[in-house]
Amino acid sequence: MLKNDLSGARVVAVHAHPDDEAITTGGVLADLAARGADVTVITCTLGEQGEVIGETFAQLVNGDADQLGGFRIHELYASLEILGVRGIHLGGAGCWRDSGMVGDPANEHPRAFIHSGDRAVEQLKELLAELKPHLLITYGPDGGYGHPDHIRAHEITHAAAGEQRILWAVSDREELEDGLKAITGLPEGWGRGELSAVDSVDLSVELNDEVYATKVESMRAHATQLWIADGSVSRTNPVAAHAVTQQDNVKVWALSNLIAQPIMRHEHYQLGAGTPLPEGATGVLDGLEF
Protein backbone atom coordinates (compact mmCIF):
# COMPACT_ATOMS: atom_id res chain seq x y z
CA MET A 1 0.00 0.00 0.00
CA LEU A 2 1.47 3.31 -1.09
CA LYS A 3 1.25 6.45 1.01
CA ASN A 4 -0.55 9.30 -0.77
CA ASP A 5 -2.13 6.96 -3.32
CA LEU A 6 -5.48 8.55 -2.42
CA SER A 7 -4.28 12.15 -2.72
CA GLY A 8 -7.06 14.26 -4.23
CA ALA A 9 -9.88 12.15 -2.82
CA ARG A 10 -12.33 13.91 -0.52
CA VAL A 11 -14.43 12.00 2.00
CA VAL A 12 -17.03 13.23 4.49
CA ALA A 13 -18.47 11.10 7.29
CA VAL A 14 -21.67 12.34 8.93
CA HIS A 15 -22.04 11.09 12.49
CA ALA A 16 -24.60 11.67 15.20
CA HIS A 17 -22.48 11.84 18.35
CA PRO A 18 -18.85 11.99 19.48
CA ASP A 19 -17.46 8.40 19.51
CA ASP A 20 -19.50 7.21 16.50
CA GLU A 21 -16.65 8.21 14.18
CA ALA A 22 -14.31 5.88 16.05
CA ILE A 23 -16.62 2.94 16.69
CA THR A 24 -18.14 2.53 13.24
CA THR A 25 -15.65 4.08 10.83
CA GLY A 26 -12.39 4.72 12.69
CA GLY A 27 -10.34 2.21 10.76
CA VAL A 28 -11.44 3.33 7.31
CA LEU A 29 -11.09 7.03 8.14
CA ALA A 30 -7.59 6.53 9.54
CA ASP A 31 -6.53 4.53 6.50
CA LEU A 32 -7.93 7.09 4.06
CA ALA A 33 -6.18 9.95 5.83
CA ALA A 34 -2.87 8.09 6.05
CA ARG A 35 -3.02 7.49 2.30
CA GLY A 36 -3.49 11.15 1.45
CA ALA A 37 -7.27 11.55 1.25
CA ASP A 38 -8.87 14.69 2.65
CA VAL A 39 -11.22 13.40 5.35
CA THR A 40 -13.78 15.39 7.32
CA VAL A 41 -16.03 14.17 10.12
CA ILE A 42 -19.22 16.16 10.63
CA THR A 43 -20.67 15.53 14.09
CA CYS A 44 -24.30 16.53 14.57
CA THR A 45 -24.62 16.72 18.39
CA LEU A 46 -22.41 16.83 21.48
CA GLY A 47 -23.75 13.57 22.93
CA GLU A 48 -25.21 15.32 25.97
CA GLN A 49 -27.50 12.40 26.89
CA GLY A 50 -24.71 9.86 27.25
CA GLU A 51 -24.01 7.98 30.43
CA VAL A 52 -20.52 8.12 31.93
CA ILE A 53 -18.14 5.23 32.61
CA GLY A 54 -16.07 5.65 35.76
CA GLU A 55 -16.67 7.83 38.81
CA THR A 56 -14.25 10.66 37.99
CA PHE A 57 -16.63 12.58 35.74
CA ALA A 58 -19.89 10.80 36.58
CA GLN A 59 -21.61 14.00 37.74
CA LEU A 60 -21.28 15.64 34.33
CA VAL A 61 -24.39 13.82 33.08
CA ASN A 62 -27.62 15.51 32.07
CA GLY A 63 -29.36 14.77 35.38
CA ASP A 64 -26.61 16.46 37.39
CA ALA A 65 -24.28 19.18 36.06
CA ASP A 66 -25.32 18.73 32.40
CA GLN A 67 -21.75 19.42 31.31
CA LEU A 68 -21.08 16.17 29.47
CA GLY A 69 -21.49 17.65 25.99
CA GLY A 70 -18.71 20.15 26.53
CA PHE A 71 -16.45 17.46 27.94
CA ARG A 72 -17.11 15.20 24.99
CA ILE A 73 -15.92 17.89 22.59
CA HIS A 74 -12.43 17.31 23.98
CA GLU A 75 -12.78 13.54 23.62
CA LEU A 76 -13.97 13.98 20.04
CA TYR A 77 -11.07 16.16 19.00
CA ALA A 78 -8.58 13.83 20.66
CA SER A 79 -10.07 11.00 18.61
CA LEU A 80 -10.01 13.02 15.39
CA GLU A 81 -6.37 13.94 15.95
CA ILE A 82 -5.49 10.28 16.38
CA LEU A 83 -7.34 9.42 13.17
CA GLY A 84 -5.65 12.29 11.32
CA VAL A 85 -8.91 13.84 10.11
CA ARG A 86 -10.69 17.20 10.29
CA GLY A 87 -13.76 17.76 12.47
CA ILE A 88 -16.76 20.06 12.06
CA HIS A 89 -19.85 20.43 14.26
CA LEU A 90 -23.05 20.71 12.22
CA GLY A 91 -24.30 24.26 12.69
CA GLY A 92 -21.49 24.95 15.14
CA ALA A 93 -20.85 23.25 18.47
CA GLY A 94 -24.05 23.16 20.51
CA CYS A 95 -26.46 23.98 17.69
CA TRP A 96 -28.17 20.59 17.95
CA ARG A 97 -28.63 18.57 21.12
CA ASP A 98 -28.52 14.82 21.63
CA SER A 99 -32.13 13.61 21.42
CA GLY A 100 -31.63 10.51 23.54
CA MET A 101 -33.31 7.21 22.75
CA VAL A 102 -36.97 6.91 21.79
CA GLY A 103 -39.13 7.96 24.73
CA ASP A 104 -36.39 9.88 26.52
CA PRO A 105 -37.63 13.25 27.86
CA ALA A 106 -34.73 14.74 25.88
CA ASN A 107 -36.83 14.07 22.76
CA GLU A 108 -38.84 17.16 23.70
CA HIS A 109 -35.90 19.55 23.96
CA PRO A 110 -36.31 22.36 21.40
CA ARG A 111 -32.75 21.85 20.14
CA ALA A 112 -33.05 18.06 19.96
CA PHE A 113 -31.54 16.89 16.68
CA ILE A 114 -34.71 15.02 15.78
CA HIS A 115 -36.40 18.42 15.42
CA SER A 116 -33.67 19.86 13.18
CA GLY A 117 -35.85 19.87 10.05
CA ASP A 118 -34.84 21.69 6.90
CA ARG A 119 -32.35 23.85 8.78
CA ALA A 120 -30.00 20.93 9.37
CA VAL A 121 -30.31 19.84 5.75
CA GLU A 122 -29.34 23.32 4.59
CA GLN A 123 -26.43 23.42 7.04
CA LEU A 124 -25.14 20.15 5.66
CA LYS A 125 -25.70 21.24 2.05
CA GLU A 126 -23.55 24.32 2.68
CA LEU A 127 -20.76 22.21 4.13
CA LEU A 128 -20.89 19.72 1.28
CA ALA A 129 -20.80 22.53 -1.27
CA GLU A 130 -17.60 23.73 0.38
CA LEU A 131 -15.98 20.33 0.96
CA LYS A 132 -17.02 18.75 -2.38
CA PRO A 133 -16.70 15.13 -1.24
CA HIS A 134 -16.43 12.24 -3.66
CA LEU A 135 -17.80 9.93 -0.95
CA LEU A 136 -20.21 10.29 1.97
CA ILE A 137 -20.36 7.83 4.85
CA THR A 138 -23.22 7.66 7.35
CA TYR A 139 -25.71 5.07 8.68
CA GLY A 140 -28.53 3.12 7.11
CA PRO A 141 -32.22 4.02 7.44
CA ASP A 142 -32.45 2.41 10.89
CA GLY A 143 -29.44 4.33 12.14
CA GLY A 144 -27.61 1.09 12.82
CA TYR A 145 -29.41 0.37 16.07
CA GLY A 146 -32.47 2.59 16.07
CA HIS A 147 -31.12 5.71 17.78
CA PRO A 148 -33.22 8.67 16.59
CA ASP A 149 -30.15 10.86 16.05
CA HIS A 150 -28.52 8.20 13.87
CA ILE A 151 -31.69 7.94 11.82
CA ARG A 152 -31.75 11.73 11.50
CA ALA A 153 -28.10 11.76 10.38
CA HIS A 154 -29.05 9.29 7.65
CA GLU A 155 -31.99 11.45 6.60
CA ILE A 156 -30.11 14.72 6.32
CA THR A 157 -27.18 13.08 4.52
CA HIS A 158 -29.42 11.70 1.80
CA ALA A 159 -31.40 14.94 1.61
CA ALA A 160 -28.29 17.11 1.30
CA ALA A 161 -26.21 14.90 -0.99
CA GLY A 162 -25.79 15.35 -4.69
CA GLU A 163 -24.80 12.37 -6.78
CA GLN A 164 -21.98 11.24 -4.50
CA ARG A 165 -21.61 7.64 -3.47
CA ILE A 166 -23.12 7.18 -0.02
CA LEU A 167 -22.03 4.22 2.09
CA TRP A 168 -23.80 3.04 5.22
CA ALA A 169 -21.62 1.80 8.08
CA VAL A 170 -22.99 -1.51 9.37
CA SER A 171 -21.83 -4.58 11.31
CA ASP A 172 -21.60 -7.93 9.56
CA ARG A 173 -23.51 -10.49 11.58
CA GLU A 174 -21.22 -13.43 10.80
CA GLU A 175 -18.01 -11.67 11.83
CA LEU A 176 -19.68 -10.19 14.90
CA GLU A 177 -21.01 -13.56 16.04
CA ASP A 178 -17.63 -15.21 15.46
CA GLY A 179 -16.02 -12.52 17.59
CA LEU A 180 -18.60 -12.92 20.34
CA LYS A 181 -18.19 -16.70 20.41
CA ALA A 182 -14.43 -16.23 20.78
CA ILE A 183 -14.87 -14.23 24.01
CA THR A 184 -14.44 -16.80 26.76
CA GLY A 185 -13.94 -14.55 29.78
CA LEU A 186 -15.70 -11.32 30.70
CA PRO A 187 -14.67 -8.61 33.16
CA GLU A 188 -16.60 -8.47 36.41
CA GLY A 189 -20.00 -6.89 35.88
CA TRP A 190 -19.90 -7.24 32.10
CA GLY A 191 -22.39 -9.38 30.23
CA ARG A 192 -23.66 -10.52 26.88
CA GLY A 193 -26.60 -9.09 25.01
CA GLU A 194 -28.22 -8.57 21.65
CA LEU A 195 -26.19 -6.43 19.25
CA SER A 196 -27.32 -4.92 15.96
CA ALA A 197 -25.95 -6.43 12.75
CA VAL A 198 -26.93 -7.12 9.15
CA ASP A 199 -26.96 -10.36 7.20
CA SER A 200 -25.34 -9.04 4.04
CA VAL A 201 -22.84 -6.30 3.24
CA ASP A 202 -21.58 -4.80 -0.01
CA LEU A 203 -18.05 -4.10 1.20
CA SER A 204 -15.78 -5.41 3.94
CA VAL A 205 -12.64 -3.36 4.51
CA GLU A 206 -9.84 -5.22 6.25
CA LEU A 207 -7.98 -3.24 8.90
CA ASN A 208 -4.26 -3.95 8.95
CA ASP A 209 -2.42 -3.94 12.27
CA GLU A 210 -1.44 -0.27 12.07
CA VAL A 211 -4.91 0.91 11.13
CA TYR A 212 -6.52 -1.35 13.72
CA ALA A 213 -4.26 0.04 16.45
CA THR A 214 -5.16 3.58 15.39
CA LYS A 215 -8.86 2.76 15.56
CA VAL A 216 -8.46 1.31 19.05
CA GLU A 217 -6.65 4.44 20.24
CA SER A 218 -9.34 6.69 18.77
CA MET A 219 -11.96 4.67 20.62
CA ARG A 220 -9.89 4.87 23.79
CA ALA A 221 -10.05 8.69 23.55
CA HIS A 222 -13.77 8.46 24.34
CA ALA A 223 -13.17 7.15 27.84
CA THR A 224 -16.43 8.46 29.30
CA GLN A 225 -18.31 6.31 26.79
CA LEU A 226 -16.17 3.29 25.90
CA TRP A 227 -14.33 0.76 28.04
CA ILE A 228 -11.70 -1.39 26.36
CA ALA A 229 -11.02 -4.60 28.26
CA ASP A 230 -7.27 -4.86 27.69
CA GLY A 231 -6.14 -3.80 31.16
CA SER A 232 -5.68 -0.14 30.25
CA VAL A 233 -6.69 2.68 32.58
CA SER A 234 -7.15 6.43 32.21
CA ARG A 235 -7.79 9.51 34.29
CA THR A 236 -11.44 9.24 33.32
CA ASN A 237 -11.72 5.56 34.21
CA PRO A 238 -8.90 4.35 36.48
CA VAL A 239 -10.39 0.84 36.76
CA ALA A 240 -8.87 -1.83 34.53
CA ALA A 241 -11.02 -4.44 32.82
CA HIS A 242 -9.70 -7.71 31.41
CA ALA A 243 -11.47 -9.90 28.85
CA VAL A 244 -10.32 -13.22 27.47
CA THR A 245 -10.79 -13.97 23.78
CA GLN A 246 -9.54 -16.75 21.55
CA GLN A 247 -8.90 -14.18 18.82
CA ASP A 248 -5.42 -12.96 19.73
CA ASN A 249 -5.51 -9.94 17.44
CA VAL A 250 -8.94 -8.66 18.55
CA LYS A 251 -9.78 -6.48 21.54
CA VAL A 252 -13.01 -6.51 23.52
CA TRP A 253 -14.94 -3.39 24.49
CA ALA A 254 -18.25 -2.17 25.87
CA LEU A 255 -20.39 0.92 26.14
CA SER A 256 -21.77 1.97 29.53
CA ASN A 257 -24.28 -0.89 29.30
CA LEU A 258 -21.29 -3.24 29.75
CA ILE A 259 -22.38 -5.55 26.95
CA ALA A 260 -19.16 -7.06 25.61
CA GLN A 261 -18.36 -6.96 21.92
CA PRO A 262 -15.28 -7.40 19.74
CA ILE A 263 -13.50 -4.59 17.93
CA MET A 264 -13.66 -6.37 14.62
CA ARG A 265 -10.82 -6.58 12.12
CA HIS A 266 -13.07 -5.40 9.29
CA GLU A 267 -15.39 -2.45 8.87
CA HIS A 268 -18.49 -3.18 6.85
CA TYR A 269 -20.58 -1.08 4.49
CA GLN A 270 -23.71 -1.19 2.39
CA LEU A 271 -24.20 0.96 -0.69
CA GLY A 272 -26.80 3.61 0.03
CA ALA A 273 -26.70 5.68 -3.16
CA GLY A 274 -24.53 6.76 -6.06
CA THR A 275 -21.81 4.98 -8.02
CA PRO A 276 -21.93 1.23 -7.43
CA LEU A 277 -18.96 -0.58 -5.95
CA PRO A 278 -17.05 -2.60 -8.55
CA GLU A 279 -16.97 -6.36 -8.21
CA GLY A 280 -14.24 -7.40 -5.80
CA ALA A 281 -13.95 -3.95 -4.21
CA THR A 282 -11.78 -3.80 -1.10
CA GLY A 283 -11.88 -0.06 -0.39
CA VAL A 284 -14.57 2.58 0.00
CA LEU A 285 -13.23 4.68 -2.89
CA ASP A 286 -12.89 1.81 -5.37
CA GLY A 287 -14.53 2.69 -8.68
CA LEU A 288 -14.56 6.45 -8.07
CA GLU A 289 -12.57 9.03 -10.02
CA PHE A 290 -10.79 11.79 -8.12
UniProtKB/Swiss-Prot annotation:
Class of this enzyme: hydrolase
Alphabetically ordered keywords of this record: Hydrolase, Metal-binding, Zinc
Catalytic activity: 1D-myo-inositol 2-acetamido-2-deoxy-alpha-D-glucopyranoside + H2O = 1D-myo-inositol 2-amino-2-deoxy-alpha-D-glucopyranoside + acetate
Residues that hold Zn(2+) according to the record: 17, 20, 150
EC number per UniProt: 3.5.1.103
Named cofactor requirement(s): Zn(2+)
GO terms (BP aspect): mycothiol biosynthetic process
InterPro entries named among the record's database cross-references: GlcNAc_PI_deacetylase-related (IPR003737), LmbE-like_dom_sf (IPR024078), Mycothiol_biosynthesis_MshB (IPR017810)
GO molecular function: N-acetylglucosaminylinositol deacetylase activity; zinc ion binding
Disulphide linkage map: none
The keyword Metal-binding belongs to this UniProt entry's keyword annotation: yes
Pfam families: PIG-L
Comment on bound cofactor: Binds 1 zinc ion per subunit.
PANTHER family cross-referenced by the UniProt entry: 1D-MYO-INOSITOL 2-ACETAMIDO-2-DEOXY-ALPHA-D-GLUCOPYRANOSIDE DEACETYLASE (PTHR12993:SF26), N-ACETYLGLUCOSAMINYL-PHOSPHATIDYLINOSITOL DE-N-ACETYLASE-RELATED (PTHR12993)
Family: Belongs to the MshB deacetylase family.
Function: Catalyzes the deacetylation of 1D-myo-inositol 2-acetamido-2-deoxy-alpha-D-glucopyranoside (GlcNAc-Ins) in the mycothiol biosynthesis pathway.
Protein name: 1D-myo-inositol 2-acetamido-2-deoxy-alpha-D-glucopyranoside deacetylase
Organism: Corynebacterium glutamicum (strain ATCC 13032 / DSM 20300 / JCM 1318 / BCRC 11384 / CCUG 27702 / LMG 3730 / NBRC 12168 / NCIMB 10025 / NRRL B-2784 / 534)
Gene that encodes the chain: mshB
